[in-house]
Amino acid sequence: MARIAGVNIPNHQHIWVGLQAIYGIGATRAKVICSAAGIEISTKVKDLTDAEMEKLRDEIAKFTIEGDLRREVTMNIKRLMDLGCYRGFRHRRGLPCRGQRTRTNARTRKGPRKPIAGKK
């Protein structure tokens, strides 16, 4: 297994698919990285040379990925909550903040239903 940015990339996959195991790299960015490094996207991870791996590492180092990206996203949400804006308020309450309805649905964000004590 190749190790890039602290993540193990599976050997049997094409390089552009394997790069998507890194947090912050999706399909489009993986293809851009491969083309910038001069590597064919259909190349398997196990067939890469050490020089190609170094080129990939150099290209990936240009982007914010993994822990730094997670920290940045967390800090952005925390900033919204500290501002007291609508989106921060919705994050604080654990509700959807992009305009979805909440009278029904939104169960993923709200969590499981809480039973209300009934009359006997």
Swiss-Prot record:
- Lineage, uppermost ranks: Bacteria, Pseudomonadati, Pseudomonadota, Betaproteobacteria, Neisseriales
User: Which BP terms does GO give this entry?
Assistant: translation
Record's keyword terms, sorted: Ribonucleoprotein, Ribosomal protein, RNA-binding, rRNA-binding, tRNA-binding
Q: What terms describe the molecular function in GO for this protein?
A: rRNA binding; structural constituent of ribosome; tRNA binding
Among Pfam families, the record links this protein to: Ribosomal_S13 (PF00416)
What NCBIfam families does its record include?
uS13_bact
- Family according to the record: Belongs to the universal ribosomal protein uS13 family.
Q: What is the top-level taxon of the source organism?
A: Bacteria
Q: What does this protein do?
A: Located at the top of the head of the 30S subunit, it contacts several helices of the 16S rRNA. In the 70S ribosome it contacts the 23S rRNA (bridge B1a) and protein L5 of the 50S subunit (bridge B1b), connecting the 2 subunits; these bridges are implicated in subunit movement. Contacts the tRNAs in the A and P-sites.
Q: Subunit structure of this entry? A: Part of the 30S ribosomal subunit. Forms a loose heterodimer with protein S19. Forms two bridges to the 50S subunit in the 70S ribosome.
| Protein name in UniProt | Small ribosomal subunit protein uS13
List the HAMAP family hit by this protein, alphabetically. Ribosomal_uS13
What is one GO cellular-component annotation here?
small ribosomal subunit
Q: Where is this region: Disordered?
A: 92-120
